[in-house]
Design a protein with these regions (language model features):
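Nucleic-acid endo/exonuclease domains
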Residues: 1-114, 118-173
């Protein structure tokens, strides 16, 4: 099936597609900020240049478009009828690259969360954002529960009296 647009029109259409500060990304950023999460945006030093980086949580968030990243079983992912072999190969390369970047981030000790464009549509938005908040809180608790507090030592004296850590005496029999 031939393309209905001229090459100049197609170029203009493709050029207008943004990769940063997209509407789904801005929704997530606004929600996180309103809930007290502080983050960095598009950190180039990390593999894949994540959309949102929460350093305190060692977590990165990618907000993927269903078409560009090939979201399987999604109504928003439909291969174009024109130039299908090109698009199929491109989407497959994007998926492979995404997988490699997630592996690299995992090896560096980062948690990765992926949100899909379809999860941020009005019907699922609230549930998705609350799930994201819950996941971040869970990651925070897991990271900080690794450092278990040691109990205070109880010092025993030879007379059978123990001195508690707060200075109070306890007599034992």
């Amino acid at each position: 099936m031939p393309d209905r647009l001229t090459p100049e029109q197609r170029h203009r259409c493709m050029k207008s597609i943004r990769s940063r500060n997209t509407k789904p990304e801005m929704m997530v950023r606004c929600y996180l900020f309103s809930r007290g999460f502080r983050y960095r945006v598009n950190v180039k030093r990390l593999p894949g240049t994540p959309d949102i980086v929460l350093r305190k949580y060692r977590t990165v968030i990618f907000i993927n478009g269903c078409f560009w990243h090939g979201h399987e079983d999604c109504p928003y992912f439909v291969l174009p009828k024109t130039n299908t072999p090109f698009w199929k190969a491109k989407i497959e390369r994007n998926r492979e690259r995404d997988m490699q970047k997630r592996i690299q981030l995992r090896l560096l000790g980062w948690h990765t969360i992926i949100l899909w464009e379809c999860q941020l549509k009005p019907k699922q938005r609230e549930m998705t954002l609350k799930g994201l908040e819950r996941a971040l809180n869970q990651i925070y608790l897991e990271n900080y529960s690794l450092h278990k507090a040691r109990p205070y030592p109880i010092i025993e004296e030879e007379t059978g009296t123990m001195i508690a850590a707060d200075g109070g005496e306890v007599t034992t029999t």
